Swiss-Prot record:
This is NADH-quinone oxidoreductase subunit A. Its EC number is 7.1.1.-. Pfam families: Oxidored_q4 (PF00507). It is a multi-pass membrane protein. GO terms for molecular function: NADH dehydrogenase (ubiquinone) activity; NADH:ubiquinone reductase (non-electrogenic) activity; quinone binding. Keywords: Cell inner membrane, Cell membrane, Membrane, NAD, Quinone, Translocase, Transmembrane, Transmembrane helix, Transport, Ubiquinone. The keyword Translocase applies. The keyword Transmembrane helix applies. It catalyses: a quinone + NADH + 5 H(+)(in) = a quinol + NAD(+) + 4 H(+)(out). GO terms for cellular component: NADH dehydrogenase complex; plasma membrane. It comes from Pseudomonas syringae pv. tomato (strain ATCC BAA-871 / DC3000). NDH-1 is composed of 13 different subunits. Subunits NuoA, H, J, K, L, M, N constitute the membrane sector of the complex. Belongs to the complex I subunit 3 family. The chain crosses the membrane at residues 12-32, 66-86, 95-115.
Length: 137
């Protein structure tokens, strides 16, 4: 039996599962477009305000700091997952795993100190920071 035929025979279950998932997604999307409401009007394009008349604009400018905090959260959260995976297998990894985890934590702390030093974690405007620095001197 050629190798490609053996590979196909080995993975036929996964192929059927994949086809089933794609078919189910297509079925649900098609059914929702058929059964869903198709009303178009002025009130459909307004933001929902819990039954009250909307006040102001729905478009708000957010500071880039919010996105920075979100990225930092995701980065440090993934790093915490790596440390959790290490803590589960700490007995099997021995001292070499412990030293590797310490190096990993040191790299994390170095990154955090760098972000702190360049001001990525400062929320105060530049003028306020300068005034506070002058007051400390």
């Amino acid at each position: 039996m050629p190798e490609s035929t053996g590979l196909i025979a080995h993975n036929w279950g996964f192929a059927i599962f994949l086809l089933g998932v794609v078919g189910l997604c297509a079925f649900m999307l098609g059914l929702s477009s058929l059964l869903g409401s198709k009303a178009w009007g002025r009130s459909k394009n307004e933001p929902f305000e819990s039954g009250m008349l909307p006040t102001g604009s729905a478009r708000l400018r957010l500071s880039a700091k919010f996105y920075l905090v979100a990225m930092l959260f995701v980065i440090f959260d993934i790093e915490a997952l790596f440390l959790f995976a290490w803590s589960v297998s700490v007995r099997e990894s021995g001292w070499t795993g412990f030293v590797e985890a310490l190096v990993f934590i040191a790299i994390l702390l170095a990154g955090l100190v760098y972000l702190w030093r360049v001001g990525a974690l400062d929320w105060a405007p530049e003028g306020r920071r300068n005034r506070q620095a002058k007051l400390k001197q």
